[in-house]
Regions:
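N-terminal capping/small domains of soluble enzymes
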Residues: 1-72, 76, 90, 106-107, ...
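Active-site beta->alpha loop and helix N-cap motifs at the rims of alpha/beta catalytic domains
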Residues: 2-5, 41, 48, 52, ...
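Alpha-helix-loop-beta-strand connector modules within alpha/beta enzyme cores
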Residues: 12-21, 65-101, 143-173, 205-233, ...
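Hydrophobic faces of well-ordered beta-strands that scaffold small-molecule active sites
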Residues: 32-36, 53-55, 99-103, 127-129, ...
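Active-site beta-loop-alpha junctions enriched in small/polar residues
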Residues: 37-39, 58, 102-106, 132-134, ...
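Catalytic cores of alpha/beta
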Residues: 38-48, 109-118, 174-185, 235-255
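Glycine-rich phosphate-binding active-site loops on the catalytic face of alpha/beta enzymes
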Residues: 52-64, 122-138, 188-203, 252-276
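Histidine/lysine/aspartate-rich catalytic loop segments that bind and position anionic ligands
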Residues: 129-156, 175-207
Length: 289
């Protein structure tokens, strides 16, 4: 059942979230998960019919006017920021949609079992691995792997979450990571193909092609499917910026949904505020005598 104290809304059990997502699919609808960095975003994302709302620190930076990658930098306590957004902004205004907490699993200052207990107690229905080292590569990724901040800790966080009856929806950047997340017990896997294009603070050149997007997405799905057959697959990032873009990937792969953060929250604000302000500026003024 939903919240046992109020009878409605968060927190949901893991099986209840899964049941809701399967119900969406049974209606012939794609699963839409949306990142929210403010209460007002979450409120109207729910009104639009999203299936999941994900809270992570990058949402706060987005709504400050900065690029999402700021959430990967040492500009604040990622875990505390996500918890604060959830407690004071999102959970109080979301009525029914399951709310997921972004967890920086490699944070060396926290006992992850203890932190996930707080996440659960706060009323979140699941966890997401953000900030995530799965989208870090090259020399720096090697340094992280060798100095106690390995992506292995993200797999361990997901396994802990499963033991604690928390739904898990996770980012991966490669087939190898997808297989490991499947082994850890992830319920939903997001094929992350890079920072989203478009808008005032999206990438322009640091983006993969459409062919690579589709190829990488399906390769991630195939790897996880070789481990388990009960996972939801969603696409995210890179050139996938509009409903038409998401549909293009869903039709070309085994994805059943899309995760939108910049493409929903940021682009929605950028476009609507710009256009609405322009409409107000069209008001003529004749000098009164």
């Amino acid at each position: 059942m939903p919240n046992p104290w109020t009878g409605t809304g968060n927190p949901y059990t893991r099986s209840e979230v899964i049941e809701r997502l399967n119900d969406t699919l049974s209606k012939g609808q794609a699963i839409i998960a949306a990142g929210a960095g403010t209460g007002i975003s979450a409120k109207f994302i729910e009104k639009g019919g999203a299936d999941l709302i994900i809270i992570y620190n990058s949402g706060r930076f987005r709504m400050m006017g900065h690029g999402s990658t700021a959430g990967m930098m040492a500009y604040g306590d990622a875990n505390a920021i996500a918890m604060e957004i959830g407690e004071y902004e999102v959970l109080p205004v979301v009525n029914e949609v399951p709310v997921i907490c972004g967890v920086h699993a490699t944070d060396p200052r926290r006992r992850m079992w203890h932190w996930l207990g707080k996440v659960k107690e706060m009323g979140f229905s699941g966890v997401n691995n953000f900030p995530t080292h799965t989208i870090v590569d090259g020399h720096f990724r090697g340094v992280l792997e060798e100095t106690g901040m390995s992506v292995q800790k993200e797999y361990e966080m997901v396994a802990l979450g499963r033991k604690m009856d928390l739904f898990s929806i996770v980012y991966v950047g490669s087939p190898e990571e997808a297989a490991e997340m499947a082994k850890a017990g992830a319920d939903a896997i997001i094929a992350h193909v890079g920072t989203t294009v478009g808008g005032s603070i999206g990438v322009t050149n640091a983006v993969v092609s459409w062919d690579d997007t589709i190829r990488r997405t399906q390769a991630i799905i195939d790897a996880a499917k070789s481990v388990r057959d009960d996972i939801f697959y969603l696409c995210h990032g890179g050139p996938i910026n509009t409903p038409e873009d998401a549909d293009r990937v869903i039709q070309a792969t085994d994805c059943v949904g899309f995760v939108g953060a910049s493409s929903l929250e940021r682009m929605g604000v950028e476009e609507s505020l710009t256009n609405l302000t322009r409409e107000f500026k069209k008001i003529p003024l004749e000098r009164k005598k």
